[in-house]
Swiss-Prot record:
This is 3-dehydroquinate synthase. It comes from Listeria monocytogenes serotype 4b (strain F2365). It catalyses: 7-phospho-2-dehydro-3-deoxy-D-arabino-heptonate = 3-dehydroquinate + phosphate. HAMAP family: DHQ_synthase. One of its GO terms (molecular function) is nucleotide binding.
Amino acid sequence: MPEITVRAKSKTYPVYINEFALEDVREKWTESLAKFSHVFVLTDEHVAELHQAKLDAVLADLPVVTYYVAPNGEEAKTFRVYEDVMTKLIETGLDRKAVLIAFGGGVIGDLGGFVAATYMRGIPFYQVPTTVLAHDSAVGGKVAINHPLGKNMIGNFYQPEAVIYDTQFFATLPEREMRSGFAEMIKHALISDQTLLRALMDTFTEPKDFYTKDLTPFLQRGIEIKANIVAQDETEQGVRAYLNFGHTFGHALEAYGNFGKWLHGEAITYGMIYALTMSETIYGLDFDLAEFKTWLKQLGYDTTFDATVPFNKILENMRHDKKTTFNEISMVLLEEIGEPVIFKAEDDLIFETYKRVMRNGGNGI
């Protein structure tokens, strides 16, 4: 089975990825899980309905397994749900020899990792992603919940014991969710690998390709790109910030939409267009943005911007970005495809770029 090793400073662990990953690692994994006092599975309503039976079959021989089913979507990454999960852990009597399994998409991985990092100052956990988007979020140890004023503002760096990535789960993903996750694959290509970007553009030309073409080699390459960056900079003191390409504007947009109007990948797509536009202005980026947007539209992305989204709200939210220091907004831009750089952006430039993308778009947002 394809296996990628993540070598973070705090921990080295495997990422198992293929169409039958759960079954392939079943014996080895359950032997490891049997050493823990209790297995606590955190999932959401949608994943529980569709896939809990499959995980139940894998965990059937373990003596003590407890489930917590969180709400769907970003609602799960709130103080209220976090507190409720903690209450469940305490009431169930989990000790420091317990283990948590985050079984779901990126939201569940973020919440589950943060719960594991903070319960009794830390218990082990496994990531079992079920979405394309989670190929990014499940790897690297960033775990967090949201605050109404900003996405992922309360969090930690806490690595899993392993990531078990069974791509069979993709078959039940709605097209919108597939597209959202694919945006992070595009991001990895833009910041690191022009050849990968061209391969994505040549291979995936319409929405049905998400289901009929093999995503696995592209997911593997994206995970390898992220693993390489995490190995250099686990806690985002330097190059790991490059993984936030498109996220400064994208997270601001998500916050404006109360973390529900746009899926994460949808907001990040707008953010990447915004960052590419600013990169043209600052670095003269040689990139056919019109061709890129046409390709995105063919895949079903909405690439147009709506001037009714108030700039002052976006700017305010951008100031809450984790890269902002001394009230200076940091953008991840590209000097060339595959050559990211951190740039301190003045408010005037942020506004001029905002006006430019608005002129080039219609009523999309």
